[in-house]
Amino acid sequence: MTRSLAVRQDVTLTPDPRRVIIKLFVPGEDAAVVRTRARALIDRVARLGDEETGRLLRDTFDRFGARHRDLAGTFHHHYDLVRHRAARARDLSPTSRLLVGAYFSHEYAVEAAALCNPSMVAHPDQTELGTGQLRVAVSLRQVGEGHVSSIGFATAVIGPGRQLTVADRSGPLAVGQRVGVRHRRDLLVAGLAEEDCDNEVAATVLDALPELYDEATFERVLANLPPDLLSRSTGLGTLEQLRRTNAGSYATAFPTDTALHQRVLWPATPAESNGMEDARFVRFVDDSGPVYRATYTAYDGRSIATRALVSSDLRRFEMTPMRGPGARNKGIALFPRTVGGRHLALCRADGETIGLTTLDSDNRWQAPAPLHAPGESWELIQVGNCGSPIETDAGWLVLTHGVGPMRRYAIGALLLDLHRPERVVAHLPGVLLAPDENDRDGYVPNVVYSCGALVHDGELWVPYGASDARVGFATVSVPALLSAMVQAPSPATATDERGGAG
């Protein structure tokens, strides 16, 4: 294998076990045999004297108050979630209720197990910068106890030249709050089609819904279904399927006084219950202006599903499922603009080949056209993308990952035609970045992996995960990278070399 073309920076990000959030803790419900102990615990707290209750609560605030935003509000919320278990909830004092909430809470270190798979986009705030500087937002895959992944962020400034400064990531974290979202009827239609749900109950609901609707409208339409339809054998099952499909779209928002690095996108639906993995962010631009888009993998402990998110400011995020044969595997990367009026994405629907998929008029990603299959020795097991294509004068620059002997991951590159991205113009025969002695050891050894790079002033900046142990940064000049590529054979030449018809 040839040596890496990219140059590593000295700056790295490592997992910080002090980055914690508060989660609901219900004793007994995490055991092999589920039997809640909530009522007994609340009864024991209620029997504490006023002095002991006050002392315990003060001690808890002293120990944990500086580590979290609005600790009292969280305790109130967790008490409200279990108050129905209290024998005489009205008899509990405000202090006792807060203490009950504390007993039903625990800290979770979001990145204690691993920190990896970053992507990089221009930050929404470009104020107070010097000449040649660009502030960037770096998305991070954070992995904590139980191998649950969430999406975090860091902020950095790149330039001039190859200078890099990463902002401090300290301060209490926030997981955001679910907020109202305007659901799209066409996405519900696509989701039901994906699950082959086409009966009179579903058709009646879809006919009654407007193009955009809120949760109250959705539930009102369900409540007004004729009894004759609900009494059919498929009635209740279809209602459950409608609610499950609709719940896949949601929105979450963070307080305005939180910094980007304090925001954590935490799993919020059953499909995401075991993690939100490998977010690939891109700044998408069309006639309505710029917006941040990303794809990520939702994991429920058994199966995966591809999700998309959109945000105008990286403070409010809307999540929706992605549908269609082009979206049935991990690692979808969106193009930063439409090409010929088409929304395009890179994918790997077959598990080993990079393909190009198009969004159709029914909001389904079509079956992909193959772009690049394993060919070089360092990528013979499988290939995939390392983030969204980057537009250059020479074409669409695509970073790839390939898997070689001993499941060693390295990063390569392709160049696609700017106007016909289904055509590969050139490829890098060697590696752009491969694990060195400093990168090879970690939770998942022998891996370098990126979910998205960025070009600034002629330099390609590649954030990368190193064996899930840390996040590093590497750079290479775009002209140097392009000059190291070799021209791809034309389709006719490739056919002749394979001994095709003729």
Predicted regions located by residue number:
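Donor nucleotide-activated moiety binding/catalytic core segment of transferases
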Residues: 378-386, 446-449
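Beta-rich carbohydrate-recognition and catalytic domains
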Residues: 1-274, 282-332, 337-381, 391-443, ...
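Electrostatic interaction modules used in gene-expression and signaling proteins
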Residues: 453-455, 463
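A conserved acidic, glycine/proline-rich C-terminal tail/linker
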Residues: 439-453
